[in-house]
From Swiss-Prot:
Belongs to the PEPCase type 2 family. This is Phosphoenolpyruvate carboxylase. It catalyses: oxaloacetate + phosphate = phosphoenolpyruvate + hydrogencarbonate. Homotetramer. Its cofactor is Mg(2+). Catalyzes the irreversible beta-carboxylation of phosphoenolpyruvate (PEP) to form oxaloacetate (OAA), a four-carbon dicarboxylic acid source for the tricarboxylic acid cycle. Its EC number is 4.1.1.31. Keywords: Carbon dioxide fixation, Lyase, Magnesium. It comes from Saccharolobus islandicus (strain Y.G.57.14 / Yellowstone #1). Pfam families: PEPcase_2. GO terms for molecular function: magnesium ion binding; phosphoenolpyruvate carboxylase activity. GO terms for biological process: carbon fixation; oxaloacetate metabolic process; tricarboxylic acid cycle. It comes from the Archaea. The gene is ppcA.
């Protein structure tokens, strides 16, 4: 049986600090190849996700890794000891990137040939897994698996002319199959994940399956509590399915450093391991790697790699029904507030520092993530914008919990263990001055302000959260937030950008 990675380094652009080895503030090109090598060699991460979704991708990464760092990769076999996993564009969703999907799939046999030359015959398959984002049905992942088998791996048998086959020209094509990891990002698909996995299992008959649960995008679209509870439902469903099919399922969770995006940081990883029992692989995003002291980062990754994997909590039907009800109540409260703040979020997001050479995510080419009726930036910019205007998104929608009875509240607390801790971590950055300033700048309605005030009042009076600065860093962040809003109002944008960067350094994450 292959090693199932415990940690997966990603290219999420959530870092405030720029690593010393980067040639510029934007990590791109050859720097991303170097970053992949350093993730393995310096940080001890088991797996690197190579992203072809929403950005220009280098499909020659394996060639560059093996030729630039031969000593390391002779000792650590790519595909056996350490892993490289492609994140594809979803051709159903990202129309302009359909051919990038095809190009990335076509590059997999090239990596196989390179490994044959480097390691010798039959030693390893360097790239054998792909991640499909925004998966909503089993048909999508079945189609990806079959596309590779039929359109890529089997093309070597095509006859060109008069008995001459493709393989006579380019050689035989390997691997013959790939493993597809669904990345499930929307609430309904997370809560019905068993249908996606079981459908794929019945058709493809894999020996095991890795399933990627998003934590960041569902938080943006439906609110933090909805995201957490949807992941808990998904983990329970996957565990039950694994038992009933007698088939191993290894969940991956996509978590960032701030509470809204998962709260996996070198300072909080133990609580996240406790929160998401049953998860095999945790994403190590850029803020985790670059915004904390290196020794602390390396030690945290080592601890995650060596931690014990506990079984997921199996939910009884009545518990699951309560959690589903909470996600609906929470989203109904959260989304209208976000829609009202959309102009502010979009205006601030374009001023945040850029950390990756990503294509535009607004307009014809690219995909703005949407919550309800409005378009929003990517989750990192979304979170960074709300923190910067002094309203951490973790607080939005919280008063919907007032609809729970005592039994429902107990079920909620049992299934979101670190709820109060996550909320308190975020609430330190709440800025009381924000209300007047955002009303003035973006003409935010009194109704929206009143709803946010209800949420923060509930957080304070019922949950017992202290809002606002409690130490030097949080007080400085609040001051910077006011200065940012004042400079933005006066259109002194160079100063606005400076304050945004300073706040991100304090948070140890852009968003």
């Amino acid at each position: 049986m292959r090693i199932i990675p415990r940690t997966m380094s990603t290219q999420h652009p959530d870092n405030a600090k720029v690593p010393e080895w980067a040639k510029s503030e934007v990590i791109e090109g050859e720097d991303e190849v170097k970053e992949a090598f350093l993730a393995y060699s310096m940080y001890g991460v088991h797996e690197v996700m190579w992203d072809a979704e929403g950005k220009d991708v280098d499909t020659h990464v394996v060639r560059k890794l093996l030729s630039n760092y031969p000593d390391y990769f002779r000792e650590h076999i790519l595909g056996k000891d350490v892993f490289l996993t492609y994140r594809l564009p979803n051709p159903k969703v990202e129309g302009a990137d359909r051919k990038v999907f095809a190009e990335t799939m076509e590059s997999i046999p090239i990596t196989y040939d390179l490994a044959e030359k480097f390691y010798g015959n039959g030693i390893t398959v360097p790239v054998f897994e792909v991640i499909l984002p925004m998966t909503t049905s089993n048909l999508e992942i079945i189609s990806v698996a079959r596309y590779y088998e039929k359109a890529v791996a089997n093309e070597d048998e095509l006859e060109l002319y008069d008995g001459v086959k493709v393989k006579d020209l380019v050689g035989e094509i390997y691997p013959k199959v790939i493993e597809v990891i669904p990345l499930v990002e929307d609430r309904d698909s997370l809560q019905n994940i068993d249908n996606i996995v079981e459908g794929y299992y019945k058709v493809i008959k894999p020996k095991y399956m890795r399933v990627f649960l998003a934590r960041s995008d569902p938080a943006m679209n439906y609110g933090m509590i909805t995201a957490v509870l949807s992941v808990k439902i998904a983990l329970s469903e996957l565990y039950k399915l694994s038992e009933s099919l007698n088939f191993e399922i290894y969940p991956i969770i996509g978590v960032g450093s701030l509470p809204f995006r998962g709260h996996l940081s070198p300072e909080n990883y133990e609580k996240v391991l406790e929160e998401y029992k049953g998860v095999y692989t945790y994403t190590i995003q850029s803020a985790f790697k670059y915004d904390y002291d290196y020794d602390k980062v390396k030690s945290a990754i080592s601890s995650i790699n060596n931690s014990r994997i506990g079984p997921a909590k199996i939910l009884e039907k009545y518990e699951e029904d309560v959690l589903r009800k909470i996600t609906i109540l929470y989203t109904e409260r959260y989304q209208p507030i976000i829609e009202s703040l959309a102009n502010a979020i979009n205006d601030v997001s374009v001023l945040l520092p850029r950390r990756r050479a990503r294509k535009l995510h607004i307009g014809l080419f690219g995909y703005s993530r949407s919550a309800g009726k409005v378009s929003l930036p990517r989750a990192i910019s979304f979170v960074g914008s709300l923190y910067s205007i002094g309203i951490p998104p973790e607080l939005i929608g919280i008063s919907s919990l007032s609809n729970l009875d005592e039994k429902e509240w107990d079920i909620f607390k049992q299934n979101y263990v670190n709820f109060k801790h996550d909320l308190q971590t975020a609430a330190r950055f709440f800025n009381w001055e924000s209300f007047e300033l955002i009303k003035d700048i973006w003409k935010i309605s009194e109704d929206t302000i009143a709803k946010i005030k209800e949420d923060i009042d509930y957080a304070e009076s019922v949950i017992g959260i202290k809002l606002g600065g409690i130490d030097y860093d949080s007080r400085k962040h609040i001051l910077m937030s006011s200065l940012f809003l004042l400079s933005f109002k006066e259109k002194i944008l160079q100063e606005s950008k400076k304050y945004l960067y300073e706040m991100a350094l304090i948070r140890r994450s852009l968003g």
